[in-house]
Every structure is written in structure tokens, then in C-alpha cells.
């Protein structure tokens, strides 16, 4: 006989994604397709999408970890854009990488210039007894 047919044939192995082979969560196949369709180069090597997916996954995990810490510090269980902003701007390297990026609904970092803070005159206030109350501060309170 010719040897063709359904009997005795080798069973096809279960398909394994390139992401699972590389131990990644990010889609290597999709990154490869986007690299080809994006006209970045005439040809795209097999290792390039794996490397790029790994880098993207690492950066995402780093930002999400810091944002999760910021959410926990604010006693929240859900990460909002404000937490992403705090995470990125408080980290020196991520702030440099994403310096030109605006995060919608992120707000700004709380910051008061030292010049604008009231003067600390603990010695002068204690020595001059002009005030009627003991230890009253000279700062304005409304």
C-alpha cells in the first residue's frame, strides 16, 4: 500500500505560542505582526519581537508595581491614573523615560517651594516676650 491514510500516522503536537515558549505574557506574535506592518525595516528577525515583548512586559510590570504601592498608600484597591502619575514621577528613571508624556487625569506632584514656606523663628519668638500667650507662633492663621 501507499502508506497514506489515517492509521499509523504521527499525531500533530499541541500548538505552543511563542509567548509561552519565551515565558512571557505579552503577545510575541502580535508584536511581530506590528513590526512587519509598521514599515520599520524591510525584514524582521525572529528574536526581535520576543525581545521587544519582554521589554514591554518588564516596563509594564515595573510601573504597575509602583502604581499599586501608590494605591495602597492612599488606602485604595483600584489603580487610577493619579496612582500611575505618582508612580512614574516619583521614580527617577521612569520620570526621565516618560518625561515628555502627559498622563490624562494624573494631576501633579505635591510640591511647595521652600521660599514660600513660613520662616521658622523658634529662637526669636521665645526670646521676645511681646506676645500675650506663651509659645504662640508668628505665622498667619486664618
From Swiss-Prot:
CDD domains: HFD_H2A
UniProt xrefs under SUPFAM superfamilies: Histone-fold
Phosphoserine carried by residues: 2, 139
Modification type N6-lactoyllysine: residues: 10
Chain positions found as N-acetylserine: 2
Location(s), subcellular: Nucleus; Chromosome
Coiled coil start-end: none
Record-level GO BP terms: DNA damage response; DNA recombination; DNA repair; heterochromatin formation; meiotic cell cycle
Region ranges (Disordered): 1-22, 123-142
GO molecular function: DNA binding; protein heterodimerization activity; structural constituent of chromatin
Entry annotated with the keyword DNA-binding: yes
Function: Variant histone H2A which replaces conventional H2A in a subset of nucleosomes. Nucleosomes wrap and compact DNA into chromatin, limiting DNA accessibility to the cellular machineries which require DNA as a template. Histones thereby play a central role in transcription regulation, DNA repair, DNA replication and chromosomal stability. DNA accessibility is regulated via a complex set of post-translational modifications of histones, also called histone code, and nucleosome remodeling.
Family of this protein: Belongs to the histone H2A family.
This protein's domain notes: The [ST]-Q motif constitutes a recognition sequence for kinases from the PI3/PI4-kinase family.
Protein name: Histone H2AX
Species the sequence originates in: Danio rerio
